[in-house]
Amino acid sequence: MVRMNVLADALKCINNAEKRGKAQVLIRPCSKVIVRFLTVMMKHGYIGEFEIIDDHRAGKIVVNLTGRLNKCGVISPRFDVQLKDLEKWQNNLLPSRQFGFIVLTTSAGIMDHEEARRKHTGGKSLGFFF
């Protein structure tokens, strides 16, 4: 079966494992976008460490879960998010003001919406987590 959206598959795997109360989850295939998204999640403490396993194919990622994640998902299609529209997206996707993050891909790399606001840059929306 062909995977259409590897980021959506990865986030759904993490979501399902978190709901079941698992300690670890295996994600395959591995991609740069997934690794950067997981790095943003790890920076904010929603997941633990993750390890990239190179199997000379598509690669695998083993993610340690902390039990802090409530929901994560992908935003499809990847809408353009301007700096002035960031507040509107925040109200639509996140449960409250100081809770959760929207992940954007910008010209300065993949980052959360607060870092994008500090760097004064917009981009395309990848997903969210809280």
From Swiss-Prot:
Lineage: superkingdom: Eukaryota
CC per GO annotation: cytoplasm; nucleolus; ribosome; small-subunit processome
Signal sequence bounds: none
Keywords attached to this entry: Cytoplasm, Nucleus, Ribonucleoprotein, Ribosomal protein
Predominant location category: cytoplasm
GO biological process, one term: translation
Compartments in which it is found: Cytoplasm; Nucleus, Nucleolus
MF annotations from Gene Ontology: structural constituent of ribosome
Similarity field: Belongs to the universal ribosomal protein uS8 family.
Role, per record: Component of the small ribosomal subunit. Part of the small subunit (SSU) processome, first precursor of the small eukaryotic ribosomal subunit. During the assembly of the SSU processome in the nucleolus, many ribosome biogenesis factors, an RNA chaperone and ribosomal proteins associate with the nascent pre-rRNA and work in concert to generate RNA folding, modifications, rearrangements and cleavage as well as targeted degradation of pre-ribosomal RNA by the RNA exosome. Required for proper erythropoiesis.
Subunit text: Component of the 40S ribosomal subunit. Part of the small subunit (SSU) processome, composed of more than 70 proteins and the RNA chaperone small nucleolar RNA (snoRNA) U3.
Protein's name according to its UniProt entry: Small ribosomal subunit protein uS8
